[in-house]
């Protein structure tokens, strides 16, 4: 019989409690449990992007130069997607494609999947960080809920859309000019600007910008400073510590301008949260639809009439011809592996030509 001598107290902490104390300790930069996901993923995503844009070519995947080493600048450098022949392979460094060869892995486009997946989990980690801190200081979690909008857009564009297509090849590459090319691709192949989900996204983002401008200007206008020397030009101090603006005055002002105004701060700020986040969610939903090649707003009757009547043309039919041109020119350049050749006589020409 074995007898263990010792005294167990309730103050004794297990490993989880020790880690919890260290991770959530009050320090200059909060770590938290979410930091175990956020910091490594953000580090690898940014590190992979800087490495790719500095050193790695896209010659083997797109037939392009895409790094500073090859002469690109900040606007033209990119971490490009893998070749279409690799489909939806995760392109793990130790996988059958690269077989542990780092140079080969970079040539195949492995950095793109590396950056995309670590970037997605890094964004999720940042949202969890906001949840964790909100819970620690007893706030509502609306900051984290709002950040789900950018996460939804990133995941839908960089992951779900190419999963619905033939491979990662059709996702955006990580670069400024590369994103612009992807936008043109979306327009030419999906008529994205006429998609109602895109319209809701634009309304949400631009509407949020308008709301921010109005809100900031209104609050700034209502700052006041008491004192004998105060006048119209000296009474406003944007750096003062006290919150001195009047909601009643703001309500009276905008009631006279528009005829309607927000009645309280809670409804006003909820609306400023609702507009951009809903717009981002709707645009993400639309991209999921494009992944399945769903179409919206095809006005076929106008196309038929424009084809039959040389004098009939609308802005819609002109845009359709423009989309055909984008497809014809972009497909041959963007998908060289398909060996697409479009003779001059089949390229789209509008009635005006």
From Swiss-Prot:
Which NCBIfam families does this one have?
A: psbD
Q: For pheophytin a, which residues are the binding ones? A: 130, 143
Where do the TM regions start and end?
41-61, 125-141, 153-166, 208-228, 279-295
Q: Which residues participate in a plastoquinone binding? A: 215, 262
Query: Cofactor stoichiometry and binding?
Result: The D1/D2 heterodimer binds P680, chlorophylls that are the primary electron donor of PSII, and subsequent electron acceptors. It shares a non-heme iron and each subunit binds pheophytin, quinone, additional chlorophylls, carotenoids and lipids. There is also a Cl(-1) ion associated with D1 and D2, which is required for oxygen evolution. The PSII complex binds additional chlorophylls, carotenoids and specific lipids.
Q: What family does this chain come from, according to its entry? A: Belongs to the reaction center PufL/M/PsbA/D family.
The UniProt record lists the keyword Thylakoid? yes
Annotated residues for binding of chlorophyll a ChlzD2: 118
Cell location: Plastid, Chloroplast thylakoid membrane
According to the record's subunit comment, the protein's assembly and interactions are:
PSII is composed of 1 copy each of membrane proteins PsbA, PsbB, PsbC, PsbD, PsbE, PsbF, PsbH, PsbI, PsbJ, PsbK, PsbL, PsbM, PsbT, PsbX, PsbY, PsbZ, Psb30/Ycf12, at least 3 peripheral proteins of the oxygen-evolving complex and a large number of cofactors. It forms dimeric complexes.
- Which residues does the record list as N-acetylthreonine (modified residue)? 2
Q: Name one GO molecular function term.
A: oxygen evolving activity
Protein name per Swiss-Prot or TrEMBL: Photosystem II D2 protein
Q: Anything further noted? A: 2 of the reaction center chlorophylls (ChlD1 and ChlD2) are entirely coordinated by water.
The record's Gene Ontology cellular component field reads:
chloroplast thylakoid membrane; photosystem II
GO BP term (any one): photosynthetic electron transport in photosystem II
Q: Cross-referenced PANTHER family, in alphabetical order?
A: PHOTOSYSTEM II D2 PROTEIN (PTHR33149:SF57), PHOTOSYSTEM II PROTEIN D1 (PTHR33149)
Where does the record place the modification Phosphothreonine?
2
Q: Which CDD domains match?
A: Photosystem-II_D2
Where Fe cation is bound, by residue? 215, 269
Explain the purpose of this protein. Photosystem II (PSII) is a light-driven water:plastoquinone oxidoreductase that uses light energy to abstract electrons from H(2)O, generating O(2) and a proton gradient subsequently used for ATP formation. It consists of a core antenna complex that captures photons, and an electron transfer chain that converts photonic excitation into a charge separation. The D1/D2 (PsbA/PsbD) reaction center heterodimer binds P680, the primary electron donor of PSII as well as several subsequent electron acceptors. D2 is needed for assembly of a stable PSII complex.
Q: HAMAP family recorded for this chain?
A: PSII_PsbD_D2
Asked if the Swiss-Prot or TrEMBL record annotates the protein with the keyword NADP, the reply is no
UniProt catalytic activity: 2 a plastoquinone + 4 hnu + 2 H2O = 2 a plastoquinol + O2
């Amino acid at each position: 019989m074995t007898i263990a001598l010792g005294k167990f107290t309730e103050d004794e902490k297990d490993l989880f409690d020790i880690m919890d104390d260290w991770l959530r300790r009050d320090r200059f930069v909060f770590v938290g449990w979410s930091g175990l996901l956020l910091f490594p993923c953000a580090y690898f995503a940014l590190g992979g992007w800087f490495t790719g844009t500095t050193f790695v070519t896209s010659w083997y995947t797109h037939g392009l130069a895409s790094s500073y080493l090859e002469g690109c600048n900040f606007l033209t450098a990119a971490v490009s997607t893998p070749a279409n022949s690799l489909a939806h392979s995760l392109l793990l460094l130790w996988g059958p494609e690269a077989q542990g060869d780092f140079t080969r892995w970079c040539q195949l486009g492995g950095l793109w999947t590396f950056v995309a997946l670590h970037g997605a989990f890094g964004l999720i980690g940042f949202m969890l960080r906001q949840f964790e801190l909100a819970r620690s200081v007893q706030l509502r979690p609306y900051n984290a809920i709002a950040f789900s909008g950018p996460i939804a857009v990133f995941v839908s564009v960089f992951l779900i859309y190419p999963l619905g297509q033939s491979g990662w090849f059709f996702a955006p590459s990580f670069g400024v000019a590369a994103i612009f090319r992807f936008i043109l691709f979306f327009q030419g192949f999906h008529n994205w600007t006429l998609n109602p989900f895109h319209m809701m996204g634009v309304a949400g983002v631009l509407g949020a910008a308008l709301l921010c401008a109005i809100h900031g200007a209104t609050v700034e206008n209502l700052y006041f400073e008491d004192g004998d020397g105060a006048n119209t030009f000296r009474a406003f101090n944007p750096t003062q510590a006290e919150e001195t603006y009047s909601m009643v005055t703001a309500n009276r002002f905008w009631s006279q301008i528009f005829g309607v105004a927000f009645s309280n701060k809670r409804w006003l700020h909820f609306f400023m949260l609702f507009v951009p986040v809903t717009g981002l969610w709707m645009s993400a939903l639309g991209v999921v639809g494009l992944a399945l090649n769903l179409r919206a707003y095809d006005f076929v009757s106008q196309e038929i009439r424009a084809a039959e009547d040389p004098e009939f043309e609308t802005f819609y039919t002109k845009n359709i011809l423009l989309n055909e041109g984008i497809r014809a020119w972009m497909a041959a350049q963007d998908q060289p592996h398909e060996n697409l050749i479009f003779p001059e006589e089949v390229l789209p020409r509008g009635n005006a030509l």
